[in-house]
Amino acid sequence: MTVLANHSFAKMNGIGNEIVIVDLRNTDSQLSAAEARAIAAPGGVPYDQLMVLQKPRMPGTTAFVRIYNNDGSEAGACGNGMRCVAKRVFGESGAQAATFETRAGLLNCWQGPSPDLYTVDMGTPKFGWQDIPLAEEFRDTRYIELQIGPIDAPVLHSPSVVSMGNPHAIFWVDDIEAYDLERLGPLLENHPIFPERANITLAHVVDRNHIRMRTWERGAGLTLACGSAACATAVAAARLKRTDRTVEMSLPGGDLTIEWRESDDHVLMTGAAVLEYEGLFDPDLFAALA
């Protein structure tokens, strides 16, 4: 029987990004992709990302955090999920700062400017075509040659691409609501140019300090919020000189403040995290896996 049967969990959200947190730091158990899918299945606990806390592997870190999408695939980064992890850990320990290890590297988190806000240092963005990664070489990733629709009248074209520990493509549009992202998102996510698939964002620059955006999240689908996409979009806009290095990002689920810090190129994300409820996993969710 899986260790998850009757195991506790916390259902949270980061400005609408649905997060489930499972703490396995007191065991040596590993969570499988099949178990991650079972949790999100009908009758389970719906989520966009599942944050699994494991024993720390490096001195000075609080936990190794594995991040799953609801299709069972693993993600390197999830900014909204890390804010939820920070809220959970800080509430239990009384700490106001912690360092977590993820597949994307070390992430520092701390209490934000008010009790309901948390800041995550998402590290440095990457722009090289091999780092994102892309299937072919592009010397300048501020825009790449990619379009969907007729050649003479493409529906979307020329995205900016950025890695924030996971691949992002940002399409600049005048109206983020004018496109059927549920139809276009999976086509672009799985485009051959993205060998590891990609998160797809539609973004509109309102002014130098404000961007509106919607995201189709790799492995999760249309989402109310994607923190790493907000970071990637803010960085991409600043690279194009369309915004300053600190911007307010308006997502369907709420707002984030993103700062691309000039001193070290780290990207800082500040936003809310909310606990919805706690519970125990129903063993029947995992019966088919026995």
From Swiss-Prot:
Enzyme class: isomerase
Catalytic activity reported: (2S,6S)-2,6-diaminopimelate = meso-2,6-diaminopimelate
GO annotation (BP), single: lysine biosynthetic process via diaminopimelate
GO CC field: cytosol
Family matches, as PROSITE patterns: DAP_EPIMERASE (PS01326)
One Pfam match: DAP_epimerase
Pathway the protein acts in: Amino-acid biosynthesis; L-lysine biosynthesis via DAP pathway; DL-2,6-diaminopimelate from LL-2,6-diaminopimelate: step 1/1
Site (Could be important to modulate the pK values of the two catalytic cysteine residues): H168, E217
Record carries keyword NAD: no
E.C. numbers: 5.1.1.7
GO molecular function terms listed in the Swiss-Prot or TrEMBL record: diaminopimelate epimerase activity
InterPro entries named among the record's database cross-references: DAP_epimerase_AS, DAP_epimerase_DapF
Chain residues that bind substrate: N17, Q49, N69, G79, N80, N166, N199, E217, R218, G227, S228
Record localization: Cytoplasm
Subunit note: Homodimer.
Function: Catalyzes the stereoinversion of LL-2,6-diaminopimelate (L,L-DAP) to meso-diaminopimelate (meso-DAP), a precursor of L-lysine and an essential component of the bacterial peptidoglycan.
Protein name as catalogued: Diaminopimelate epimerase
Organism name: Afipia carboxidovorans (strain ATCC 49405 / DSM 1227 / KCTC 32145 / OM5) (Oligotropha carboxidovorans)
